[in-house]
Regions:
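Peripheral terminal and linker regions in Fe-S/redox and tRNA-modifying enzymes
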Residues: 1-173
Length: 173
């Protein structure tokens, strides 16, 4: 849930595989993590679908804290530099310097941005709010919504919807 609600130029897909058999297909995702005997390998910028592309190894044998730090940096750098609706794989393909440049920014902090990227991610994580949970739990917000089909006994049902019973199941007629 760490990245839940993270707004990015395009949807993000992640996977974690517990071994090198790679059952979760982590190398076909925007961020893929594969367990090793010494820690975790971090793969980035993969893509499935119409234009499949294997993710590339960004860093290997990472401990958990370093892994999360690199993922945070990667996501924030992508969010800040990618074009609207641009997948990570296309972003990476268009990046001058390619994977070497990305490694230098994320792993080696060549631009001196690491602390700022991490701070921004922590801010996003710390201020995340599930809008739908707020709507469900706050009666004032709930007043803006109206019941449609599933009106309870004490609520006004929609008069335009007729229910029938067919084979013992309620159907909309």
């Amino acid at each position: 849930n760490r990245y839940k609600g993270l707004r990015s130029p395009h949807k993000l897909k992640m996977a974690v595989s517990g071994c090198t058999r790679e059952c979760a297909e982590a190398q076909g995702k925007d961020v893929g993590v594969i367990a090793t005997e010494k820690g975790w390998n971090l793969y980035v910028c993969g893509n499935g679908g119409m234009k499949p592309r294997h993710a590339e190894l960004l860093a290997s044998d990472l401990d958990k804290e370093t892994l999360i730090r690199y993922i945070d940096r990667f996501f924030m750098f992508y969010i800040q530099t990618a074009d609207r609706l641009q997948r990570t794989s296309v972003w990476r393909d268009n990046m001058e310097g390619g994977l070497d440049y990305l490694k230098s920014v994320i792993v080696d902090d060549s631009l001196g941005l690491a602390a700022e990227l991490e701070r921004r991610m922590e801010h996003i994580i710390g201020t995340y709010q599930d809008e739908w949970r707020t709507a469900v739990e706050n009666p004032e917000v709930r007043k803006r919504f109206q019941t449609y089909i599933n009106a309870g006994a004490n609520e006004q049902a929609d008069p335009h919807i007729q229910f029938t019973t067919e084979r013992g199941q309620i159907q909309i007629g």
